[in-house]
Amino acid sequence: MRKIERIFVHCTAGNQKQTLQQLKDEFIRKGWKNPGYHYVVFPDGKLVQLLSEDKVSNGVQGYNSTSINVSYVGGIDKQGRPLDNRTQAQKDTLYALLMYLKQQHPKAHILGHRDIWGKNSKNWKKYCPCFDAEEEYKDINNML
Protein backbone atom coordinates (compact mmCIF):
# COMPACT_ATOMS: atom_id res chain seq x y z
CA MET A 1 0.00 0.00 0.00
CA ARG A 2 1.25 3.49 -0.87
CA LYS A 3 1.97 5.97 1.92
CA ILE A 4 -0.36 8.89 1.24
CA GLU A 5 0.91 12.27 2.49
CA ARG A 6 -1.31 14.61 0.47
CA ILE A 7 -4.76 14.70 -1.06
CA PHE A 8 -4.75 17.24 -3.85
CA VAL A 9 -7.93 18.94 -5.04
CA HIS A 10 -8.05 19.93 -8.71
CA CYS A 11 -10.37 21.34 -11.34
CA THR A 12 -10.37 19.89 -14.85
CA ALA A 13 -9.93 23.41 -16.31
CA GLY A 14 -12.66 22.59 -18.79
CA ASN A 15 -16.27 23.61 -19.05
CA GLN A 16 -18.88 21.98 -16.87
CA LYS A 17 -20.25 20.02 -19.81
CA GLN A 18 -16.98 18.12 -20.21
CA THR A 19 -17.70 14.40 -20.49
CA LEU A 20 -15.83 11.49 -18.98
CA GLN A 21 -14.65 10.47 -22.45
CA GLN A 22 -13.36 13.97 -23.20
CA LEU A 23 -11.44 13.91 -19.95
CA LYS A 24 -9.93 10.50 -20.73
CA ASP A 25 -9.04 11.69 -24.25
CA GLU A 26 -7.18 14.66 -22.74
CA PHE A 27 -5.01 12.35 -20.65
CA ILE A 28 -4.23 10.28 -23.75
CA ARG A 29 -3.34 13.44 -25.72
CA LYS A 30 -0.87 14.32 -22.98
CA GLY A 31 0.72 10.90 -23.39
CA TRP A 32 -0.05 9.81 -19.84
CA LYS A 33 -0.19 6.13 -18.97
CA ASN A 34 -2.53 6.84 -16.06
CA PRO A 35 -5.21 9.52 -15.57
CA GLY A 36 -4.50 12.81 -13.84
CA TYR A 37 -6.94 12.05 -11.03
CA HIS A 38 -8.05 9.11 -8.94
CA TYR A 39 -11.56 10.58 -8.65
CA VAL A 40 -13.58 13.12 -10.60
CA VAL A 41 -16.87 14.80 -9.58
CA PHE A 42 -19.35 15.89 -12.24
CA PRO A 43 -21.74 18.87 -11.94
CA ASP A 44 -24.65 16.61 -10.93
CA GLY A 45 -22.54 15.29 -8.03
CA LYS A 46 -21.77 11.97 -9.68
CA LEU A 47 -18.44 10.57 -8.47
CA VAL A 48 -16.32 8.46 -10.83
CA GLN A 49 -13.19 6.63 -9.78
CA LEU A 50 -10.71 6.79 -12.67
CA LEU A 51 -7.84 4.96 -11.01
CA SER A 52 -7.36 2.68 -8.03
CA GLU A 53 -5.76 4.45 -5.07
CA ASP A 54 -2.89 1.94 -5.06
CA LYS A 55 -1.80 3.28 -8.46
CA VAL A 56 -0.02 6.59 -9.11
CA SER A 57 -1.95 9.25 -11.05
CA ASN A 58 -0.54 12.27 -12.89
CA GLY A 59 -1.97 15.07 -10.75
CA VAL A 60 0.99 17.06 -9.40
CA GLN A 61 4.44 16.49 -10.85
CA GLY A 62 6.93 15.51 -8.18
CA TYR A 63 4.24 14.60 -5.62
CA ASN A 64 2.25 11.84 -7.30
CA SER A 65 3.85 8.83 -5.62
CA THR A 66 2.56 9.92 -2.20
CA SER A 67 -0.69 11.63 -3.24
CA ILE A 68 -4.31 11.00 -4.11
CA ASN A 69 -5.69 13.42 -6.70
CA VAL A 70 -9.36 14.38 -6.87
CA SER A 71 -10.99 16.82 -9.27
CA TYR A 72 -14.24 18.51 -10.08
CA VAL A 73 -15.36 19.11 -13.67
CA GLY A 74 -15.09 22.83 -14.38
CA GLY A 75 -12.86 25.58 -13.10
CA ILE A 76 -12.99 28.11 -15.94
CA ASP A 77 -15.47 30.65 -17.23
CA LYS A 78 -16.62 31.07 -20.86
CA GLN A 79 -13.51 33.13 -21.62
CA GLY A 80 -11.19 30.46 -20.20
CA ARG A 81 -10.38 32.39 -17.02
CA PRO A 82 -10.11 30.63 -13.64
CA LEU A 83 -13.45 30.44 -11.83
CA ASP A 84 -14.76 28.43 -8.91
CA ASN A 85 -17.92 27.23 -10.62
CA ARG A 86 -18.58 24.13 -8.54
CA THR A 87 -22.22 23.27 -8.20
CA GLN A 88 -23.66 22.58 -4.76
CA ALA A 89 -23.80 18.90 -5.73
CA GLN A 90 -20.08 18.96 -6.54
CA LYS A 91 -19.30 20.69 -3.25
CA ASP A 92 -21.31 18.11 -1.32
CA THR A 93 -19.72 15.14 -3.09
CA LEU A 94 -16.20 16.55 -2.77
CA TYR A 95 -16.70 17.13 0.94
CA ALA A 96 -17.96 13.59 1.50
CA LEU A 97 -15.15 12.12 -0.60
CA LEU A 98 -12.49 14.11 1.25
CA MET A 99 -13.95 13.04 4.61
CA TYR A 100 -13.75 9.42 3.50
CA LEU A 101 -10.19 9.78 2.16
CA LYS A 102 -9.03 11.53 5.33
CA GLN A 103 -10.44 8.67 7.41
CA GLN A 104 -8.56 6.19 5.23
CA HIS A 105 -5.35 8.26 5.28
CA PRO A 106 -5.42 10.23 8.56
CA LYS A 107 -1.94 11.72 8.15
CA ALA A 108 -2.66 13.07 4.66
CA HIS A 109 -3.05 16.83 4.23
CA ILE A 110 -5.77 18.18 1.92
CA LEU A 111 -4.69 21.06 -0.31
CA GLY A 112 -5.25 22.54 -3.74
CA HIS A 113 -2.89 21.94 -6.66
CA ARG A 114 -1.86 25.61 -6.59
CA ASP A 115 -0.86 25.37 -2.93
CA ILE A 116 2.41 23.61 -3.70
CA TRP A 117 3.62 27.07 -4.77
CA GLY A 118 2.52 28.74 -1.51
CA LYS A 119 -0.28 31.14 -0.63
CA ASN A 120 0.89 34.09 -2.74
CA SER A 121 -0.90 34.01 -6.10
CA LYS A 122 2.09 35.65 -7.79
CA ASN A 123 3.94 32.36 -7.30
CA TRP A 124 1.19 30.11 -8.68
CA LYS A 125 1.89 28.39 -11.97
CA LYS A 126 -1.78 27.31 -12.04
CA TYR A 127 -4.92 28.53 -10.28
CA CYS A 128 -6.23 24.99 -9.89
CA PRO A 129 -8.61 24.29 -8.18
CA CYS A 130 -9.74 27.95 -8.36
CA PHE A 131 -10.61 28.15 -4.65
CA ASP A 132 -8.72 27.90 -1.36
CA ALA A 133 -8.98 24.17 -0.65
CA GLU A 134 -6.94 24.31 2.55
CA GLU A 135 -9.30 26.91 3.99
CA GLU A 136 -12.46 25.20 2.76
CA TYR A 137 -11.46 21.80 4.13
CA LYS A 138 -9.58 22.90 7.25
CA ASP A 139 -12.13 21.15 9.47
CA ILE A 140 -11.35 17.85 7.73
CA ASN A 141 -7.60 18.48 7.90
CA ASN A 142 -7.89 19.14 11.64
CA MET A 143 -10.22 16.27 12.54
CA LEU A 144 -7.62 13.54 13.05
How would you describe each model-predicted region?
Residues V70:
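Ligand-binding face of N-terminal immunoglobulin V-set domains in extracellular IgSF glycoproteins
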